[in-house]
Regions:
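A generic structural signal for short, non-catalytic loop/turn and secondary-structure boundary residues
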Residues: 35-37, 60, 101, 124
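Acidic-leaning, charged glycine-interspersed low-complexity segments
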Residues: 89-134, 138
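Hydrophobic beta-strand residues in large extracellular and virion-surface proteins
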Residues: 8, 12, 42-44, 67, ...
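Small/polar-rich, solvent-exposed N-terminal microdomains that initiate assembly or binding
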Residues: 1-57, 91-97
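Mid-chain, well-packed structural core segment of small domains
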Residues: 72-93
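Oligomerization/assembly interface segments of phage tail-like spikes and tubes
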Residues: 59-75, 125-137
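Short acidic, gly/pro-rich beta-turn/loop elements at beta-sheet edges
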Residues: 54, 77, 139-140
Length: 140
């Protein structure tokens, strides 16, 4: 869902400092580094989710997404994913900087805590966290 990806990226770029969002946030994939040139990278990808609830006057949309961060400095990657997860968890209770009002954010919650994923051949550390979102079409 393009709106969700662009809105979350916009929100994170608006509220978090550059030492947390230390690379451009891309959709779906992390940049690939080499042994001679490791690369810092942040990615957001939509992952499978159950359908939303049906209501008398419409329905909600449920989406889940994963944020991955990668850096040759493991502490930098860990600090970044923890700050991103803290910012996004229960975001529906705060101000959400979406790209437009096509959807109304009902809930946005972290459902898997930040954790280590892997170390690449270029000695980059990858961390991730998973989030669940419920949206209503035609926000306010």
């Amino acid at each position: 869902m393009k709106w969700l990806v662009e809105s979350v990226i916009n929100h994170l770029n608006t509220v978090l400092p550059s030492n947390i969002v230390y690379a451009p946030i891309k959709a779906n994939v992390l940049d690939v580094g080499t042994n001679n040139e490791p690369r810092k990278s942040i990615a957001l990808r939509i992952i499978p989710a159950a359908p939303g609830q049906q209501y008398f006057e419409g329905e909600t949309i449920r989406k889940q997404f994963q944020i991955l961060v990668k850096s040759p400095n493991g502490l930098e990657a860990m600090s970044s994913i923890e700050a991103i997860a803290d910012e996004l968890h229960n975001l529906h209770m705060h101000s959400f900087h979406s790209i437009d009002d096509s959807y109304n954010l009902i809930t946005l919650e972290k459902y898997v805590e930040p954790n280590w994923v892997d170390k690449t051949e270029a000695n980059e550390q990858i961390y991730t966290a998973l989030f669940s979102v419920e949206l209503e079409i035609g926000g306010n």
